[in-house]
Amino acid sequence: FGSGVGLNSFAVVTIGIGVGYSLTVNGEPIENPDKSYGLVGHTLVDPDGPRCISGHKGCATCLTDNSIATEYSEMIGHPATFDEFAAAARASKTQATNLVNRTCFRLGTLIATIANLAMPDKIMIAGESSFIAKLGVGDLRNGINMYRHSQAAPVDFEIADHDWAMWGKAAAAQAIRQYVG
């Protein structure tokens, strides 16, 4: 089931409370003992972006809900939650829309980096905040195109609606595969 069926390789990037990344090749997820350290979160996506709690400037951690809420709060001049940002973005409020576009360009930069290095057949964008990518898909494409060679194949990507049931099915499928083969 799902968008990865029939593909030789695919990557999944998640945005929300954190930033996640996984790669599947020949139907098998790439396993590594370092996978739980959130390594993709410290990939540079905007040299002028905000600092993360580790002190990195412009790393992919700026795609997390907390970082977006902080950046939005600075833009509007008072504290705001991520949910307030999301409501303003969905209502096309100017400052929220500007941050959506900036965030999507940054996400596109991350997608291009993954496409350039891992060369998956497709990249899925998922997570509880993936709706942001749908609001700024033009800037997402601009971010990809900025860092993707013009003669390389276009990056095939899909923005998934967040669905906890799909996460559960994916986990169940992995467990079943281990026992059934």
Could you tell me what each predicted segment is?
Residues 1-58, 176-181:
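Phosphate-binding/catalytic loop of phosphoryl-transfer enzymes
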Residues 1-6, 48, 59-181:
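ATP-binding/phosphotransfer module of carbohydrate and carboxylate kinases, centering on a glycine-rich
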